[in-house]
Swiss-Prot record:
The gene is rpsG. SUPFAM superfamilies: Ribosomal protein S7. Part of the 30S ribosomal subunit. Contacts proteins S9 and S11. Gene3D superfamilies: Ribosomal protein S7 domain. The keyword tRNA-binding applies. Belongs to the universal ribosomal protein uS7 family. Keywords: Ribonucleoprotein, Ribosomal protein, RNA-binding, rRNA-binding, tRNA-binding. It comes from Mycolicibacterium smegmatis (strain ATCC 700084 / mc(2)155). This is Small ribosomal subunit protein uS7. HAMAP family: Ribosomal_uS7_B.
Length: 156
């Protein structure tokens, strides 16, 4: 086993257009096959569409959407005496942000709109209004944690 410990987190640079680390993280989540300029075009286009539809700062809309999607609890598998229990645990802040961004991007890819820009923009707008598949995913995660609350004493 390695003895050096975990690798240090690399600092994220602020996004050049909006000056936000969240937008940088979103670009990195949209990124496929190393095509960063395409990912930036998709994210900036989606944020611009969100600005046109709401008339407010798109970074504020994105933050509101993330707050509605971030999970507070999740279940982790824990093996105890031959049985595997789904143990509810609290989610660290950095992981909750990562999960929220991942869910936003994945569920926007499954939407029916024509372009990825429209899909991402509409998923962000839906999430900021408390609607959409990514918010439903968060609710399902919380329901699973609540249903398995009896195993909470197995937390580690």
């Amino acid at each position: 086993m390695p003895r050096k410990g975990p690798a240090p987190k690399r600092p994220l640079v602020n996004d050049p257009v909006y000056g936000s680390q969240l937008v940088t993280q979103l670009v990195n989540k949209v990124l496929l096959e190393g095509k960063k300029s395409l990912a930036e075009r998709i994210v900036y286009g989606a944020l611009e569409q969100a600005r046109e539809k709401t008339g407010t700062d798109p970074v504020v809309t994105l933050k509101r959407a993330l707050d509605n999607v971030k999970p507070a609890l999740e279940v982790r598998s824990r093996r105890v005496g031959g049985a595997t229990y789904q143990v509810p645990v609290e989610v660290r802040p950095d992981r909750s942000t990562t999960l929220a961004l991942r869910w936003l991007v994945n569920f926007s890819r499954q939407r029916r709109e024509k372009t990825m820009v429209e899909r991402l923009a509409n998923e962000i707008l839906d999430a900021s209004n408390g609607l959409g598949a990514s918010v439903k995913r968060r609710e399902d995660t919380h329901k699973m944690a609540e249903a398995n609350r009896a195993f909470a004493h197995y937390r580690w």
